[in-house]
């Protein structure tokens, strides 16, 4: 019952209705469509929310109202909605738990501070909120230790700032089938904007249309401070499906002022496309132990990276799956297309594009790449390697514009070299220094088939 004083008349009327309350008809009365939390006890918001959810389908926090001291867990019943126009505040220990069909929505600046939304059901929606606070590890947590299948998660139109992590998924114990995380702005975070960790059971994940700014871990935490990160479990060069994060798309991301924008470990069957990056440099998250790159891929199979525009930024790292110094896997079967990297006005050297690829049956295709004041470095040997429409310029004082290091025979990583039916195909590939002179370093060519057309350098003599 709403928190209001009862007059003697109201009290007598209520008392006369007590017998009626025990009838089956009374017990079957549906919850009201909407209740206002302002009608409940303001001295105990925890109890008030629990009562409100028992009485209404939607609990509304009206504009101008601040509900503070939300410092414990509150379960939103299945199918019910928390709609926020005012503000909810806690000390970091409070959370709202979403069950099947639960929704938390915001409007007109509706906000949450130091409170976690804990997703534990299917058909959940979180949208329209402003979220902040360094109290909890993350603003939205998706996971838990119970085995369950969660379907059709929607997270949309959030503004998250001045927090640790924004969205954290721990996926080892459960499964998500279908998640759309869209149209959010993440800024001034210590941790990741989105971390999808050990998500080996998930599929059909869309992460798109986000703005990510100023991700800078200064608290000494290791591996914090990435824009968007997805990871499977243990690296394995056979790329088993049940150990990889898979079947996802990351698209339409605008990012700036962070150390690493997009990160994938042990993934397969994915697409990264339409990325615009500015100022992705080592000036951020200096002690977090993460590589500086706009896109960092480790030990992945069967993927596409398409339409990446980078300015004054570290470029791309596509490298081995490594644990404690042991090389466990190498990237294979991928295409990198429509890449622009312009570091013309950058005051210092940063990574250009570094690619390690291999395995006995594998392919790599690099197409439509333009790089200014940056290097393209290729390591190890995939079975079939294609390069088309490549233009690279790097200053001679820094090093060659294009490096091809195929000969790994004396390197422990040589175990990943393709050796049978190998193909190298180059067409319209130009690598120059600032004077327009050829700037290429190639160690050894021993591919079974070599096709070359319109390149501005000579290949080493073929060797057996």
Curated annotation (Swiss-Prot):
<dbReference type="GO" id="GO:0009103">
    <property type="term" value="P:lipopolysaccharide biosynthetic process"/>
</dbReference>
<protein>
    <recommendedName>
        <fullName>Colanic acid biosynthesis protein WcaM</fullName>
    </recommendedName>
</protein>
<dbReference type="InterPro" id="IPR011050">
    <property type="entry name" value="Pectin_lyase_fold/virulence"/>
</dbReference>
<keyword id="KW-0732">Signal</keyword>
<keyword id="KW-0448">Lipopolysaccharide biosynthesis</keyword>
<feature type="signal peptide" description="Tat-type signal">
    <location>
        <begin position="1"/>
        <end position="28"/>
    </location>
</feature>
<dbReference type="GO" id="GO:0045228">
    <property type="term" value="P:slime layer polysaccharide biosynthetic process"/>
</dbReference>
<dbReference type="InterPro" id="IPR023882">
    <property type="entry name" value="Colanic_acid_synth_WcaM"/>
</dbReference>
<comment type="pathway">
    <text>Slime biogenesis; slime polysaccharide biosynthesis.</text>
</comment>
<dbReference type="InterPro" id="IPR012334">
    <property type="entry name" value="Pectin_lyas_fold"/>
</dbReference>
């Amino acid at each position: 019952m709403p928190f209001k004083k009862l007059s003697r008349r109201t009290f007598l009327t209520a008392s006369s209705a007590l017998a009626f309350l025990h009838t089956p008809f009374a017990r079957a009365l549906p919850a009201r469509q909407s209740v206002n939390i302002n009608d409940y006890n303001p001295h105990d918001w925890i109890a008030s929310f629990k009562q409100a959810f028992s009485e209404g389908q939607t609990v509304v926090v009206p504009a101008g109202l601040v509900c503070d001291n939300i410092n414990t867990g509150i379960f939103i019943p299945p199918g019910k909605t928390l709609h926020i126009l005012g503000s909810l505040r806690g000390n970091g220990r409070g959370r709202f738990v979403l069950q099947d069909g639960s929704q938390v929505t915001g409007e007109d600046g509706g906000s949450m501070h130091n409170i976690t939304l804990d997703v534990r059901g299917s058909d959940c929606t979180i949208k329209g909120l402003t979220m902040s606070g360094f109290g909890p590890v993350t603003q939205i947590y998706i996971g838990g230790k119970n085995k369950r299948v969660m379907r059709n998660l929607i997270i949309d139109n959030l503004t998250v700032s001045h927090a640790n992590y924004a969205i954290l998924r721990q996926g080892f114990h459960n499964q998500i089938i279908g998640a759309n995380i869209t149209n959010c702005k993440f800024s001034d975070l210590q941790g990741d904007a989105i971390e999808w960790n050990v998500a080996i059971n998930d599929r059909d994940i869309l992460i798109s249309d986000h703005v990510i700014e100023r991700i800078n871990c200064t608290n000494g935490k290791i591996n914090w401070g990435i824009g968007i990160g997805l990871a499977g479990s243990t690296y394995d060069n056979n790329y088993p499906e049940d150990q990889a994060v898979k079947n996802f798309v990351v698209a339409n991301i605008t990012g700036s002022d962070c150390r690493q924008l997009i990160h994938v470990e042990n993934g397969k069957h994915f697409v990264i496309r339409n990325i615009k990056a500015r100022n992705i440099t080592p000036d951020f998250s200096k002690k977090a132990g993460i590589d500086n790159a706009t896109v960092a891929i480790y030990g992945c199979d069967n993927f596409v990276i398409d339409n990446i525009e980078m300015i004054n930024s570290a470029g791309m790292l596509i490298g081995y799956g490594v644990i404690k110094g042991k090389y466990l896997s190498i990237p294979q079967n991928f295409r990198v297309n429509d890449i622009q990297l312009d570091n013309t006005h950058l005051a210092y050297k940063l990574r250009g594009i570094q690619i390690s690829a291999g395995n006995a049956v594998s392919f790599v295709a690099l197409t439509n790449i333009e790089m200014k004041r940056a290097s393209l470095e290729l390591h190890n040997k995939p079975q079939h390697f294609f390069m088309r429409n490549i233009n690279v310029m790097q200053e001679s004082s820094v090093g060659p514009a294009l490096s091809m290091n195929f000969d790994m025979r004396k390197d422990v990583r040589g175990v990943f070299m393709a050796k049978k039916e190998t193909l190298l195909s180059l067409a319209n590939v130009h690598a120059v220094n600032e004077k327009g002179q050829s700037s290429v370093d190639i160690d050894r060519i021993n591919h079974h088939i070599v096709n070359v057309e319109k390149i501005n350098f000579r290949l080493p003599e073929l060797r057996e």
